[in-house]
């Protein structure tokens, strides 16, 4: 029993202990929670205190900023007030000087009048005594008294006139002061209102930002034309007062009616202006009052009568021309200015003599002509190293038979003297170790055929022409030697031009070559820049200024860069390695002038390399002009399709091609990328739309798209974002797209070389490819090229294609058809003497065809739209027709009467010539009567003719679109018509380049007609200036290159 009690008590004891522990632990937890909550409360209070302190600090900072801004505003106001006081003081001084000058001028005029009266009295007295010596003295004394009275009367008139002029000047100055005070008060109120609004907003920084534009605006307005409310009405009052004073014999205030020039173009008041702004009263004094004082000082003393007054005004007007010449484009002067035309006569002397043909040549100067030719004899070029190739022993030991067999194995053909032997491995090329490591990393195991032969030739410093099939590694064949060549020369510093220059015909090819070079140049520390149109020129210019060893470019944009800033951006003096990729297109007639001009600006001892997959003979003749003893390399045949490409040509009409394309897409869409070629931009977009409707996502690429769209399209196509691309021939050259399995020529290529490059987009770098070409019976003229391509690449020729080509060649032999061109010798004007002569000859032939007889004495400027009298040509034709009719009547009458005529001219002397014949037969009488009738009709026409006016024409059809839009817009034509008084209308029809103008049609031109010859000349000169500005803007600002036909909205 006792043990059970003990056990129970111990159990209770343990339970109590556990309860105590639980209470203590719960108390401990409560204390800890209480401490944690109190600490959180303290932290919260600390954060609130910090936030309050930050707010106080920000508030104090804002108050300091506000005080600082107010202090700055007060200081600015003090400076403004000080400036106003200084201006008022200067104005008072100028007013005093002006009054003193006027008084001196009036006193001098008075003295001269007195001297003139004294001389007149002396002459009259001398004349009186000479003829009437015997007259009594009484009348002579009376005459002297009358003369004294006249002198006193003249002096009173002069004094009255002087007082009126002084009063008018004082009133004018008072009016100006009142307006200036009103303007200053208005400006001060505006500034206070703005400052009050900014203070209410409580943003100090914005107040500082708003004060600066307001101050700049006030300064800008001060330099502009100053007009206040009521200015025009007061000016009209001044004009009436000036007219009244002119009627009274003075010319003091008559010039006040001229409006204030823009910006104060006079030099008299330039020293009195502050550097930051132009005071309106200063501008008025400099442009109005001081010139009037100069006029009064330069005027002759006696200008009492109207005739002398008029001549003096003319002298003053002519004297104003001696200032600095004004150029076209200034603010159009007011209608009341009599010297509007006279101010620019000297400026336009040259432009009037310049005919429209010379103007077109000057304005439409090509890019190649804008790049000046360098005289290499005056430049001291530094020598450089060309030959880096050392033949290894394994290659040296090869016998001639072994070399020939190896070349045959590589399908190589070489032409030239001492051609190096082809290499077998990369190590034998003579490249640096860094280049060899990069080649190994990129996975190039051994050189391809063109590389095996081109590398030793180019590394030896020889010029070469490389002709290899598409996808054969031509880019690497010239990039690797160029990198070795550049690395051997001194480093490029900012301001130097590139050492290596690569030119390509398309922008996409430039981007691709640039990306290939970047793979190697980064390891060597060489900078490479891509220069091409359609993209921002600012970044390209900045990269060139930093220095670039290699430049990859299109010729047009490169010439733009070379011409910009007079050649200060970059130059070609250091170019020692020149490459032209796709050289056959580079030397086509469209590119040849630009290429030639760039080549002429590089040093003569450079190394030049040309590569292409096709190279016709006629283009090779042009290309060899820039080469020195070149070596020609051919891989396979010349202009031959790669044998790894399976070619299929199908004769299909236009309406069956789309369904056949869908069938091909269903078969090849999942195998790889597909490229479809069409012949035009419209066809490209329409086919894109049709494929989208049939569920095929695709991309389009053509020259009408923006450059950014073209780059993103190619990037998406190469990166498998989309595997179907529809393109024009802009994608036919040089583009390397991995896994491109099928090429479809939806429209047949228009020449053989284009076909080779199109199908060469597949089957690259040893891969197999497939190409399908559609041709219809209407396109039979292109069938022989397709047969040639298939035969040269050892492909089977379909029977229907062979029959199509045979039928066309039979028609050619019969003369009913003409074989199409080679696709070379493109368009593009050269603007040289030959084209000028051809144009003139064609124009003369057309004139003869329509029965017009040109005047031998007329110059081209008269023919090409010079100013002429309206109706002058019609009157001349009427007179010529009348004379011809009279001659025919006289000749017929004379032949009927069996009379001999000795002259063919029957002009105004025709009646006298006919009347001199003594035989009064009936035929002679009829001829005489006909001549008289014609002359009477001409006299009647001239009597009822319209008033004489002048007209001219200015052709604008061939100018860029922005220039045509600007020159035909009313915002441009309106001020010119108002200024010159000539009417300008747009006539004719716009004809794109290459479109033939019809017989009864005219190209787009401006027709100018006016009441005077001078007005028409001035209007035409101003129109030419606007066109020239637009043309220069298009050529000299390559960043604004013309966009294509399409744009993405």
Swiss-Prot record:
Q: Which Pfam families match?
A: DEAD, Helicase_C, KH_12
List each copy of the Helicase C-terminal domain by range. Answer: 644-805
Q: Where is the composition biased (Low complexity)?
A: 201-214, 262-272
Q: Which organism is it from?
A: Oryza sativa subsp. japonica (Rice)
EC assignment: 3.6.4.13
- GO CC terms, sorted: nucleus
The protein's UniProt keywords, in alphabetical order, are: ATP-binding, Coiled coil, Helicase, Hydrolase, Nucleotide-binding, RNA-binding
Q: What is this protein called?
A: DEAD-box ATP-dependent RNA helicase 42
Annotated ATP binding sites = 468-475
Q: Report the top EC class in one word.
A: hydrolase
Q: Which GO terms describe its biological process?
A: mRNA splicing, via spliceosome
**PANTHER family per UniProt:** ATP-DEPENDENT RNA HELICASE DBP3 (PTHR47958)
Instruction: State where composition is biased (Basic residues).
Output: 118-131
